[in-house]
Amino acid sequence: MGNSLRYLGRIEEADQRFAQALKLKPDYFNAYRNRGTLHAWTGRIDLALKYYADAMRLHPQDAELHRNLGVISLLQGNFDIGWKEYRYRWQCTDASQPRYSQPKWTGQDLQGKTILLYAEQGLGDTLHFVRFAKILQIAGARTIVHCQASLAAILQGCEGISSLVPNTWKVPDHFDYHCSLMDVADVMQIDLSNIPGETPYIKSPPNLVAYWKRQLNQLLPPAKHRIGIVWQGNPNHQADMFRSFPLESLEPLCNIDDVQLISLQFGKGSEQIKSWKGSKPIYQLPDDLDQSSGAFMDTAAILHHLDWIVTSDTSLAHLAGALARPTVVMLGFTPDWRWLLDRPDTPWYPTMHLIRQTTIGQWHSVAQQVADFLTTKLQPAT
């Protein structure tokens, strides 16, 4: 019951349920672990660590518990501990590590070798960590990237990939080592001092960028500044309630002078445009966007013609960052680990600005800060 309430966002009720369960059964491992996760989600890190420690005393080898502790350490910027604990994710029931006859790469010399790099988790994770292919290629490796089929087109423009294989295709047999893209960061002992933050590492075809310059000028009225907006991420993500926000939250953006708001939202969430009451219209792009050229291809080209992108924590945020486009990410009270804590920037993407929620569930004030920030950035130089 506590977990069900957590997924519904009924935080205090969930905590009470866990407390009741522990009162009845003081050695209830799942209650300790899930109570810790509840507090981790809501930013009460000290409480989360307390309940995780209680759970650890009962089951010191629990994989999910170690994974969760890894996430907290990464969020806090303690990458040395974080990567080690996060390795336990492969032992969790919701993760499956591919099995190959070739050895896993754990730091062996790659000069003249071929390494298979495979995606794990979501599209945003792949866009985020595919940067490491270039580093391994520079180290002498031939890199094969096995990625989600929907990313195959856009990753054709990614530096450092020798060969790209969609995950709907059979993996080639001829490689020397394998490693997940995310585990490369672990093997390389990436921390805050050596994050490879050079962008862009994904590039759009120049002809497609030129095409969309012409198209936007035909489809949209003239505008001094164009801002692309995204508000809804994957509704099936377990943390979606803390990441996505209603479109109406973005009304403060209408107070920015001489801006045009362009929706980059497709599928779930786009229906909210019908009930938009902001003082500036939201312009929508053609429904067949990305259909002929491949997922993200048209979108990426369009990003080159926007002054700023304002987005929730979605795969598009990673795409914009990888393209080195000026981007503001609106983050929930406790963000995903890669955004760290208490800073307005990210070492992963130098063209990105982070604005963080200060109260769970309140997005209007975040959007107001975005509007103030963009007003400063877009005002004429004096």
Model-derived features with residue positions:
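Alpha-helical solenoid repeat scaffolds of the TPR/TPR-like class and their adjacent stem/linker regions
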Residues: 1-382
